[in-house]
Curated annotation (Swiss-Prot):
Pfam families: Pur_DNA_glyco. Its EC number is 3.2.2.-. NCBIfam families: 3mg, PRK00802.1-1. It is an enzyme of class 3 (hydrolase). Belongs to the DNA glycosylase MPG family. One of its GO terms (molecular function) is alkylbase DNA N-glycosylase activity. GO terms for biological process: base-excision repair. Keywords: DNA damage, DNA repair, Hydrolase. This is Putative 3-methyladenine DNA glycosylase. The keyword Ribonucleoprotein does not apply.
Length: 202
């Protein structure tokens, strides 16, 4: 069952933790890709210097952050990579959760070819773990880019999130790659499933 709209209309911390174990579904090139969300980070613009929406900063790039929860926010970094976020809260809240890592569940050859131009069986053990163990890696594997910005995630389309009854222990720790964010560096707003091998950093 697809997660409903109400799931997303909550605080980013709740949504980021709640997304763990849920299933990201991508339909592309006639193929259905599914990945279990195993790592997320929360960003709350009103108090978070690491957020693109800190202090109400609104630009064309950050506008999705100010929409009602349940849409995709995809941005481009370093002129090379994309990152996929799930917007949370009410309109104008400036909140969201970065999807940091997935555990791929099917169509391994497709995502392996996307990432490494090799079939899954040709990959080393290390490379198999690296298919989707980072925000840009999962975007490459699942073909997520700027065309997916603003997409509604609570309706069936080519990008949505399904519920799951996954049981797991959640680890809470600091976020990655935000050395500029002053006191927000220490916020324990990164969440991951304990002992999952696809987590980007433990």
């Amino acid at each position: 069952m697809i997660l409903n709209r109400e799931f997303y209309k909550r605080d980013a911390l709740e949504v980021a933790k709640g997304l763990l174990g849920k299933i990201l579904v991508r339909e592309i090139d006639g193929v259905i890709l599914r990945g279990k969300i195993v790592e997320t980070e929360a960003y709350i613009g009103s108090i978070d210097k690491a957020s693109h929406a800190y202090n109400g900063r609104r630009t064309e790039r950050t506008e999705p952050l100010f929409k009602e929860g349940g849409i995709a926010y995809v941005y481009f970094i370093y002129g090379l990579y994309h990152c996929f976020n799930v917007i949370s809260g009410e309109s104008d809240d400036g909140q969201g959760a970065l999807i940091r890592a997935l555990e791929p569940l099917d169509n391994f050859d497709y995502i392996s070819l996307k990432r490494f131009n090799k079939k899954f069986e040709e990959l080393s053990t290390v490379k198999k773990r690296e298919l989707t163990n980072g925000p840009s890696k999962l975007c490459m594997a699942f073909g997520i880019d700027k065309k997916d910005n603003y997409k509604v995630l609570y309706e069936k389309g080519d990008l949505y999130i399904e519920d799951s009854c996954d049981n797991h222990e959640i680890i809470e720790t600091t976020r990655i790659g935000i050395d500029y964010a002053e006191e927000a560096i220490d916020f324990p707003w990164r969440f991951y499933i304990k002992d999952n091998k696809y987590v980007s950093k433990k």
